[in-house]
């Protein structure tokens, strides 16, 4: 009888119930809410499902993120080894490879002025940097936080790892991916506030056809120009353009399919679960996290507003040939931001098709955010 009692006692002690804190319960509830948003409402399920499940796991069983050096036998937890790939900036670079293989830069090549809209939307990054500095974050932490304004999760993780801001990598990544998934909710009110109905109804001229030679030369030229000026951008811009060259060359179909499908989804699983696993109650439930989330929202709103306002300027300069709504697509949430531009434009005029025009600033924003990250790395002397 005593043996049975001891055995049952040991079993009870091994359950998670004995170690759950109020903070863990709060984070479990947050994880379930994210799963609900992803599954029930379809808010970027490819991102939110693995992130939320990683969040769920680490708050039930913290040792799944146990660092190898803290382990009695020298073996870390499963998700710790996934997370190491985040710290080393391997997974974000592979994400860019997959994104490049999936991206059509044709609208940007056909309308190079889109680069200006993509650049304007990066204003949110530098606004967030100043805001983070004002809130008491160090200069490197402020730089890592500011990339949230570009709505670019992989770049946020990449820069946080490079600047050795791993203590806030979890909140940064969760905020960035959350705002990426909430683009359809956050952007429309800002877009409607800053534009008139007449502006939203503007129809743009059809884009010119882009030749195969232009498509092949584009990733090569961008790599040479950007990586020569800012070599620190090579891991992101280089991988992005390599993936696109796979796609546009037409001679490595197997590599294109692998990079844009199997490899991409494997990396998303590893990245999402490991990022979610950094959100233990002890690491996440603090004032710094609230500041980061608030700064991210402000930065994203500023970036959207800056893009729309620059779009209005281009509309005025071209005498009404540019719909300002495409400026909001300058953030690098691809293709969600472009779809939002299309949706808001169609609400004003159902016959208005802005999607391809918005894709130009959208893909320019991806390059712009990577360049912003490279600029911060150059400023701090990080390679």
Predicted regions mapped to residue ranges:
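N-terminal alpha-helical transmembrane segments of multi-pass membrane transport
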Residues: 1-74
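Intrinsically disordered, low-complexity non-transmembrane regions of multi-pass membrane transporters
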Residues: 1-19, 25, 71, 75, ...
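Entry/N-cap segments of selected transmembrane alpha helices
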Residues: 32, 108-129, 280-307, 358-362
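Interfacial helix-loop-helix linkers and transmembrane-helix boundary segments
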Residues: 39-48, 66-67, 81-82, 102-117, ...
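Alpha-helical membrane segments and immediately flanking helix-loop junctions
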Residues: 88, 96-102, 117-127, 131, ...
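Alpha-helical transmembrane segments
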Residues: 167-185, 295-303, 326-327
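Membrane-embedded hairpin module used as a gating/binding unit in multi-pass transport
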Residues: 175-251
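Transmembrane helical segments that form the transport core of multi-pass membrane transport proteins
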Residues: 223-310
């Amino acid at each position: 009888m005593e043996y049975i009692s001891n055995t049952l006692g040991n079993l009870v002690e091994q359950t998670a119930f004995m170690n759950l804190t109020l903070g863990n319960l709060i984070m479990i509830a947050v994880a379930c809410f994210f799963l609900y948003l992803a599954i029930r409402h379809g808010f970027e399920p490819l991102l939110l499902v693995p992130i939320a499940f990683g969040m769920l796991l680490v708050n039930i069983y913290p040792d799944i993120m146990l660092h190898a050096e803290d382990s009695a036998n020298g073996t870390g937890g499963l998700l710790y080894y996934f997370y190491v790939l985040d710290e080393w900036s391997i997974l974000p670079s592979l994400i860019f490879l997959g994104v490049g293989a999936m991206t059509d830069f044709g609208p940007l090549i056909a309308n190079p002025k889109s680069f200006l809209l993509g650049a304007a939307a990066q204003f949110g990054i530098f606004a967030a940097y100043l805001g983070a500095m004002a809130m008491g974050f160090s200069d490197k932490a402020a730089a890592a936080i500011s990339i949230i304004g570009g709505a670019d999760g992989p770049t946020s993780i990449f820069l946080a790892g490079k600047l050795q801001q791993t203590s806030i990598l979890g909140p940064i990544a969760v905020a960035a991916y959350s705002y990426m998934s909430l683009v359809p909710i956050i952007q429309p009110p800002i877009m409607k506030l800053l534009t008139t109905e007449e502006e939203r109804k503007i129809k743009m001229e059809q884009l010119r056809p882009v030749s195969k030679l232009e498509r092949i030369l584009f990733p090569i030229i961008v790599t040479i120009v950007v990586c020569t000026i800012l070599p620190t951008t090579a891991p992101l811009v280089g991988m992005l353009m390599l993936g696109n060259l796979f796609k546009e060359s037409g001679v490595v179909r197997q590599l294109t399919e692998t990079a844009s499908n199997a490899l991409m989804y494997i990396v998303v699983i590893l990245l999402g679960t490991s990022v979610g696993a950094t959100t233990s109650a002890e690491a996440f439930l603090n004032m710094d996290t609230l500041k980061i989330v608030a700064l991210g929202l402000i930065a994203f709103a500023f970036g959207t507003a800056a893009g729309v306002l620059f779009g209005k300027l281009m509309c005025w300069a071209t005498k009404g040939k540019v719909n300002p709504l495409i400026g909001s697509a300058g953030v690098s949430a691809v293709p969600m931001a472009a779809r939002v531009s299309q949706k808001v434009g169609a609400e004003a005029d159902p016959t208005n098709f802005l999607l391809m025009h918005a894709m130009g600033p959208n893909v320019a924003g991806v390059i712009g955010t990577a360049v912003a990250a490279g600029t911060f790395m150059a400023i701090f002397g990080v390679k």
